[in-house]
């Protein structure tokens, strides 16, 4: 997960898309503290931050030598400030990755519309950003542009080449890649089928809107590894506005299920306010979101389970699987993607049998594939053994990828089996988790919407600490198996 910081003149004007004509004197975040921003990211589980170094209005948060429309012309630090330098230093000290957002659309620069001149201008500013501020791990290229604006041809592939030359480890995001792609909405909503495999030639960068489903779902027959990114703001707008309130912690948890839990990267925008700090109400929500994740996912209810597999590579085609074999089914209880269960080759049935050793109540399934070996599974389901010895399907899905989270009505059972129905190659599973989430409404996860919660963070944590049998936050039917 990454944090997005939308910050600039819009923070002081109440606008989302600035005109490019607002005077720089309005920019004066007197208490700006980049260390505070980075600390907030790190303690809440976000290992990367991205700053809007230049948004559509053209105002630069660093003292660019190619324009006067920057912090150099503002009263902040008497024109000597550099937001990106402050953020870079804080990120390096904390071990947090840094990314930059440089808007292609520029409403201030007069040469915008002149293809050759503006592309030269853009490359010059990109060079500044990629050579002054240490290691840059992410470059975010926004495809937004207002109607009626000047025609402009962007030299995307020239930009990509420059980025890879100056920052070889940087991931480049645009609507269609080349390294990560947009999921197609700003709700934090990933597709229920999501392949990290893609064919960018089928969706040119400017043509993603012609086939939004392809962009969201990816392509099992694709030739490139281009994972999907889900971006969403903690507030109604992308920039801070004093009249707006943040989403609730449960809202963010629902988004987590539908983004990270659907093989997507979550980029959550938390905009600094006009003083240069993250607002207290946003901090409270982030802390609540973190506590929710920890309380639900910190203990795998299957951690002490007995496991068997329909087959295990290197042990023949029969059911079983020892604890110490290289591809043991017990590998799915170890965190990390470099240990995994692998079935014998050329099998037509792939099943993991799970004995929890006692009756356990749960409503969340977590699965992971070792993606360094590619994304393989295209159909799976989980079954639980009924008390009259009848197997009953609990949930099912299509793709897994780096992580899949499925929520369903509460189940109580001891014996489970994970059945892989279809796979592009022999399926490999690196992790399997079973959890109890007592606060999220199952129907909101099943439906592709983000609901407004009536619980605040304090109430949520209180609910989680109660016995699950007394929790009244879910309207889902309980399946007693």
Where are these regions (language model features)?
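Activation corresponds to long, low-complexity, non-globular regions
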Residues: 283, 445-461, 478-481
């Amino acid at each position: 997960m990454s944090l997005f910081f939308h910050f600039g003149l819009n923070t002081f004007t109440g606008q989302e898309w600035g005109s490019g004509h607002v005077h720089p004197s309005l920019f004066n975040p007197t208490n700006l503290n980049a260390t505070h921003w980075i600390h907030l990211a790190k303690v809440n589980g976000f290992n990367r931050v991205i700053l809007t170094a230049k948004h559509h209005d053209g105002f630069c948060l660093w003292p660019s030598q190619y324009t006067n429309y920057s912090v150099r012309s503002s009263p902040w630090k008497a024109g000597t400030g550099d937001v990106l330098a402050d953020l870079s230093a804080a990120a390096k000290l904390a071990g947090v990755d840094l990314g930059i957002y440089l808007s292609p659309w520029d409403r201030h620069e007069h040469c915008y519309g002149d293809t050759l001149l503006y592309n030269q201008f853009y490359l010059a500013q990109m060079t500044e950003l990629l050579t002054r501020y240490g290691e840059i791990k992410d470059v975010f290229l926004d495809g937004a542009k207002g109607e009626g604006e000047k025609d402009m041809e962007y030299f995307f592939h020239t930009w990509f080449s420059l980025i890879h030359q100056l920052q070889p480890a940087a991931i480049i995001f645009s609507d269609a890649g080349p390294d990560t792609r947009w999921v197609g909405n700003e709700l934090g909503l990933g597709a229920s089928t999501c392949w990290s495999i893609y064919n960018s030639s089928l969706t040119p960068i400017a043509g993603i809107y012609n086939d939004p489903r392809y962009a969201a779902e990816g392509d099992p027959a694709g030739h490139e590894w281009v994972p999907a990114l889900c971006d969403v703001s903690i507030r109604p707008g992308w920039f801070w506005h004093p009249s707006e309130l943040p989403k609730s912690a449960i809202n963010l948890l629902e988004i987590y299920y539908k983004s990270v839990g659907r093989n997507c990267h979550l980029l959550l925008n938390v905009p600094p306010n006009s003083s240069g700090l993250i607002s207290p109400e946003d901090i409270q929500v982030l802390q609540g979101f973190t506590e929710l994740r920890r309380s639900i996912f910190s203990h795998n209810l299957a951690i002490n389970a007995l496991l068997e597999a329909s087959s295990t590579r290197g042990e023949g085609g029969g059911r079983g699987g020892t604890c110490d074999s290289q591809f043991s089914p017990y590998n799915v209880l170890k965190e990390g993607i470099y240990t995994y269960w692998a079935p014998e080759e050329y099998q037509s049935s792939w099943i993991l049998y799970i004995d929890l050793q006692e009756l356990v109540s749960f409503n969340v399934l977590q699965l992971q594939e070792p993606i360094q070996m590619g994304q393989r599974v295209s159909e799976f389901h989980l079954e639980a053994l009924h008390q009259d010895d009848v197997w009953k399907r609990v949930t099912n899905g299509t793709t897994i990828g780096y992580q899949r989270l499925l929520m369903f009505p509460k189940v109580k059972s001891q014996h489970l089996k994970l059945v892989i129905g279809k796979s592009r190659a022999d399926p490999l599973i690196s992790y399997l988790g079973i959890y109890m989430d007592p606060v999220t409404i199952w129907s909101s996860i099943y439906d592709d919407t983000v609901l407004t919660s009536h619980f605040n963070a304090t109430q949520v944590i209180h609910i989680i600490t109660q016995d699950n049998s007394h929790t009244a936050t879910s309207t889902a039917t309980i399946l007693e198996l």
